[in-house]
Design a protein with these regions (language model features):
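RNA substrate-binding interface of SAM-dependent RNA methyltransferases
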Residues: 1-23, 87-88, 92-102, 111, ...
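Class I S-adenosyl-L-methionine
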Residues: 1-79
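Alpha-helix capping/helix-boundary segments
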Residues: 9-11, 56-57, 86, 135, ...
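A contiguous loop/helix-start segment that scaffolds small-molecule binding in enzyme catalytic cores
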Residues: 47-48, 126, 130-217
Length: 217
């Protein structure tokens, strides 16, 4: 009955491709507190509501948690479809241990950022972050200061897209790479934990996706 989208302009392209013309409304981080209760009322009246993201999976560094929590509190069934999540392929292709890991998502932009990093200094599991391209270099430089420039890291961008690319090496090497090469696209940083921080994955390398992915115009 209702489709909630992070950005209706983006989602409408996909929906039009499949001739889906159900009611479409925006549901994002700036309005989810206001819209959650009205959505709950529609669900309680017997309607069916779908929540989709621009990319990735709702709730994973995307809107969705608040609405799901309200559904659970109100005894409303939530069905989740397996979807794309950037950090999983980034982790698998990093060459770093993926049997144990922690997902940190986006770091605070200002307040609490340094404190958050300091709490992770002794983390032995592989650590995964999301970052925007214009903050990537500064973030990697901060990582070098906090974790040491010899710590192994893999930076993946544009996962599942035509220009998919992974840059692997020590923090010092990857900082040097992105000092010379402007980062673009959506970024996933996979950082080695303390147990394997000094063990090289490989010499610094850049791998690119050989296969073009399906595009919907």
């Amino acid at each position: 009955d209702l489709i909630l989208a992070e950005d209706t302009r983006t989602s409408s392209v996909l929906l039009r491709h499949y001739d889906i013309d159900n009611e479409l409304r925006s549901h994002h981080k700036f309005n989810e507190h206001q819209t959650a209760q009205s959505v709950i009322k529609r669900l309680q009246s017997g309607e069916t509501v779908a929540l989709i993201s621009d990319a990735g999976t709702p709730g994973i560094s995307d809107p969705g948690f608040l609405l799901v929590r309200e559904c659970v509190r109100n005894g409303i069934e939530v069905q989740t479809l397996p979807g794309a999540t950037a950090f999983v392929p980034a982790l698998v292709s990093s060459g770093l241990p993926c049997d144990k890991f922690c997902f940190e998502g986006f770091l605070p932009q200002k307040k609490g950022r340094q404190t958050r990093l300091q709490t992770l200094q002794d983390e032995s599991r592989t650590i995964i972050f999301y970052e925007s391209p214009h903050r990537l270099l500064k973030t990697l430089q901060q990582f070098s200061e906090v974790f040491g420039e010899k710590r192994q890291v893999s930076v993946c961008r544009e996962i599942s897209k035509i220009h998919e690319e992974s840059v692997r090496g020590t923090l010092a090497e990857v900082v040097e790479h992105f000092t010379q090469t402007e980062p673009r696209g959506e970024i996933v940083i996979v950082l080695a934990g303390t147990d394997n921080g000094e063990k090289p994955v490989k010499e610094k390398n850049v791998s690119k996706n050989k296969y073009k992915k399906d595009n919907i115009e």
